[in-house]
A protein has these predicted regions:
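Active-site catalytic motif of lipid deacylating hydrolases and related acyltransferases
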Residues: 33-110
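Bacterial N-terminal signal peptides that target proteins for export
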Residues: 1-13
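C-terminal region of N-terminal signal peptides and the immediate post-cleavage residues
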Residues: 18-35, 134
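Serine-dependent carboxylesterase/thioesterase catalytic core
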Residues: 93-114, 118-150
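Cytoplasmic membrane-interface segments at the C-terminal ends of transmembrane helices
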Residues: 2-3, 27, 103
Length: 150
């Protein structure tokens, strides 16, 4: 349980750093049509229905006024969020693919990445943090985000 608390603290720090950098500096206008200035990519928690989840919705609601006139949208990470925790890697893979797409299509868009509960584990995989608990071989683990995308 102690390690899980540190994961939550780590995710909160990551989000706070992202918010600080977005609020403190001017975000350049997105270059491509249809690209937001800022996009929240969020992985919902275990057993939450598809979408951003309770924590993701709250974070998006907090981001909008903090960023003033800058356009903000959100991408809900597509993964089962079930009690089959080996599928957490599906969320990491979906987020990784979406990040690569955004970097290619909307290079000036600032990305804020977050997750809650199992979603935080999916996001942690992108940073190369190994999953907690038991694994069978390499199942349940996703490759870290390509440094060129970070």
């Amino acid at each position: 349980m102690k390690l899980r608390r540190w994961q939550v603290v780590g995710m909160a720090v990551a989000v706070a750093v992202s918010l600080f950098s977005l609020a403190g500096g001017r975000v350049p206008a997105a270059r491509a049509d249809g690209c937001p200035d800022v996009q929240l990519i969020f992985a919902r928690g275990t057993a939450e229905p598809p979408g951003l989840g309770v924590a993701g919705d709250a974070l998006l609601d907090a981001l909008r006024p903090a960023l003033g006139s800058r356009s903000v949208d959100a991408y809900p990470v597509n993964y089962p969020a079930s009690y089959n925790f080996l599928q957490t890697a599906d969320g990491a893979n979906d987020a990784r693919d979406h990040i690569a797409q955004m970097v290619d299509q909307c290079p000036a868009t600032k990305l804020v990445l977050g997750g809650f509960s199992q979603g935080a584990a999916a996001v942690s995989m992108l940073a190369g943090v190994p999953p907690l608990g038991e694994r069978i071989g390499n199942f349940g683990s996703a490759p870290a985000l390509d440094p060129g995308l970070a």
